[in-house]
Amino acid sequence: MEVNTYLNAIILVLVVTIIAVISTSLVRTEPCVIKITGESITVLACKLDAETIKAIADLKPLSVERLSFH
């Protein structure tokens, strides 16, 4: 009887491991992209917490007048 319980425990661990591997491989995460052009700022697939929102709010589109080339 102990061998049967041991085998059941091993099978349970294997099934749980396989389910975990499959579920994590199905979840795809997109990289956070912040695109700044001369006309707009676009935020794609970013996790927006208070700090990120504050940082994005301070951004401005690029303009040649504000760029300096030294």
UniProtKB/Swiss-Prot annotation:
Gene Ontology CC: one annotated term: host cell endoplasmic reticulum membrane
Entry keyword set: Host endoplasmic reticulum, Host membrane, Membrane, Transmembrane, Transmembrane helix, Transport, Viral movement protein
InterPro entries assigned to the protein according to its UniProt record, in alphabetical order: TGBp3
Intervals, Cytoplasmic compartment: 28-70
Subcellular location: Host endoplasmic reticulum membrane
BP-aspect Gene Ontology terms: transport of virus in host, cell to cell
Transmembrane domains' residue ranges: 5-27
Domain of life: Viruses
Lumenal compartment segments: 1-4
Pfam families: TGBp3
Other comments on record: TGBp1, TGBp2 and TGBp3 seem to act together for cell-to-cell propagation. TGBp1 is the main movement protein that physically cross the plasmodesma with the viral genome. TGBp2 and TGBp3 would facilitate TGBp1 function.
Function: Plays a role in viral cell-to-cell propagation, by facilitating genome transport to neighboring plant cells through plasmosdesmata. May induce the formation of granular vesicles derived from the endoplasmic reticulum, which align on actin filaments.
Family: Belongs to the Tymovirales TGBp3 protein family.
The name this protein goes by in its record: Movement protein TGBp3
Organism expressing this protein natively: Potato virus X (strain X3)
